[in-house]
A protein has these predicted regions:
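A structural boundary/capping signal
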Residues: 1-237
Length: 237
């Protein structure tokens, strides 16, 4: 009797990746989203490309550098040397969400650029997190004693954002904003929206971005694939 090896489907693979929150592989899971569009993509090759970038970055950081020095090295490497940037001219291109393409073209949207930036930051031992800010995904570095507080960065541009700039970005998303009512942003309100996003939340936002793009394009085949992933990722929703 002949036995044929049954290879797991891309959805089976995705299901395995997102089973547990205890050890959720953000980068690998984000890369795997591209399998719907690029079924022959070699995920390990993409992960290896990121590892090479991490190794190159580490060689640029001096021993005993503090967190802010590491952050400067990271941003210089990512935005200036590697020239990762936001895809301003084609923001709604779904390929901006596929990390194999983002790595190749050095262009993406805030959340896809953030996933790569976070991986590089973590390779330096930095306490970096994604921030699911309304309307625009951000990243932040948590500082520890003696450098307390955090630095919030727009991964689309590489800019560090002040409290006032963050408040200005938040105001349009608050109740009453469309009525033109003046808004005052409390520290507690801002802190709430600057909470660290869990990996599962980041992947969900990436999928919802794709869902919205394909919905507008009335691409039912791709919509179905995105919905299947969301159902696996968020079974209780």
């Amino acid at each position: 009797m002949d036995y044929k090896l049954q290879l797991p489907s891309v959805l089976d693979y995705f299901t395995t990746l997102v089973q547990s929150d205890d050890d959720f592989p953000l980068l690998e899971t984000a890369v795997s989203l591209a399998q719907d569009e690029f079924p022959k993509m070699d995920i390990q090759q993409v992960l290896d490309e990121v590892d090479v970038l991490c190794a190159r970055l580490k060689r640029r950081v001096l021993p005993h550098s503090d967190a802010l020095d590491k952050l400067r090295a990271l941003n210089t490497f990512f935005f200036e040397d590697m020239r990762f940037a936001g895809n301003v001219n084609h923001y709604d291109d779904p390929h901006n969400s596929y990390l194999n393409v983002v790595l190749s073209k050095r262009l993406g949207i805030p959340i896809s650029l953030a996933v790569l930036w976070l991986e590089l930051g973590q390779s330096l031992g930095l306490k970096v997190h994604g921030v699911s800010f309304p309307g625009h995904f951000l990243v932040k570095l948590d500082l520890v004693y003696p450098q307390e507080g955090h630095v919030v960065i727009d991964p689309f541009t590489g800019e560090s954002l002040s409290r006032d700039e963050l408040a200005d970005r938040l105001i349009p998303w608050l109740p009453g904003a469309k009525l033109g009512k003046p808004q005052a942003i409390s520290d507690d309100a801002l802190a709430f929206h600057l909470q660290a996003a869990e990996p599962r939340q980041i992947i969900a936002r990436m999928l919802r971005n794709l869902h919205e793009i394909y919905r507008r394009q009335d691409d039912q085949e791709r919509l179905a694939k995105v919905r299947a992933r969301l159902a696996v990722l968020l079974p209780d929703n």
